[in-house]
């Protein structure tokens, strides 16, 4: 493991367990209601990649309700300065430079999956509010391919739609839909690049469908 990856791995998310009871209380006080559909699609144990829509800075905080175990987050490197950086590292976040992603960040994510952790990545690469979903690049699919090569097992990718009503503000209603997991093997093509594109398109289609259900018609059924 590279030096930067070893430094990241030395920071354990011990604050996650300490703040867990207060986290639930904070959410119940701030938001009017949080509704979750599709819990049956969420693997109990890792390795797993959770791939949510990214609408707000609240997303990681809200989505942490999906697991009592620490969730590891790949987060924009500009969020890691000062006290904020100290806190979010100990909540399970690790940095990535979105403008120039480093190999060490990818390697660290692979090592987390090898350790059977739950990893949350926002496939849009940042907060997107002006459209239902930004077109996805193949970075997440590439990570899945690398992780499966290293672990020798299939890594489920779980699309997650999230909607705030009316928006991500005080007393908003939050609806989360966990969608069926995707597997790289189901998108196998004649060459590696085509396979990564196919998985990316599958993830994008699942997220678009999930977001459409949450924002237009009747909520999904349990």
Question: Regions from the language model: what does each represent?
Answer:
Residues 2-11, 104-222:
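Non-catalytic C-terminal accessory region of glycerolipid acyltransferases
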Residues 26, 40-41, 63-64, 85-86, ...:
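Short secondary-structure boundary/capping segments
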Residues 42-100:
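Catalytic core of membrane glycerolipid acyltransferases/transacylases, capturing the structured
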Residues 36, 81, 103-106:
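Structural motif corresponding to alpha-helix initiation and N-cap regions
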Residues 34, 69-71, 91, 117, ...:
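A structural micro-motif
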Residues 1-49, 67, 84-85, 92:
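Membrane-anchoring hydrophobic helices of lipid-metabolizing enzymes
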Residues 32, 99-103:
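A conditional alpha-helix N-cap/helix-loop micro-motif detector
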């Amino acid at each position: 493991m590279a030096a930067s990856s070893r430094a990241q791995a030395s920071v354990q998310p011990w604050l996650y367990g300490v703040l867990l009871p207060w986290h639930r209380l904070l959410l119940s006080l701030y938001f009017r209601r949080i509704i979750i559909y599709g819990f049956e699609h969420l693997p109990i144990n890792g390795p797993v990649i959770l791939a949510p829509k990214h609408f707000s800075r609240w997303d990681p905080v809200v989505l942490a309700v999906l697991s009592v175990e620490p969730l590891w987050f790949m987060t924009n490197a500009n969020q890691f300065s000062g006290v904020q950086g100290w806190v979010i590292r100990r909540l399970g976040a690790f940095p990535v430079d979105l403008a120039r992603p480093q190999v060490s960040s990818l390697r660290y994510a692979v090592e987390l999956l090898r350790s059977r952790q739950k990893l949350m990545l926002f496939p849009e690469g940042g907060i997107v509010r002006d459209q239902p979903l930004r077109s996805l690049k193949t970075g997440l699919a590439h990570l899945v391919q690398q992780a499966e090569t290293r672990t020798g097992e299939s890594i489920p990718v779980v699309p997650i739609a999230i909607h705030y009503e009316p928006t991500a503000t005080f007393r908003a209603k939050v609806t989360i839909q966990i969608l069926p997991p995707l597997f790289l093997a189901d998108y196998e093509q004649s060459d590696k690049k085509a396979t990564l594109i196919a998985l990316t398109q599958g993830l994008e289609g699942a997220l678009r469908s999930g977001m459409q259900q949450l924002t237009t018609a009747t909520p999904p059924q349990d």
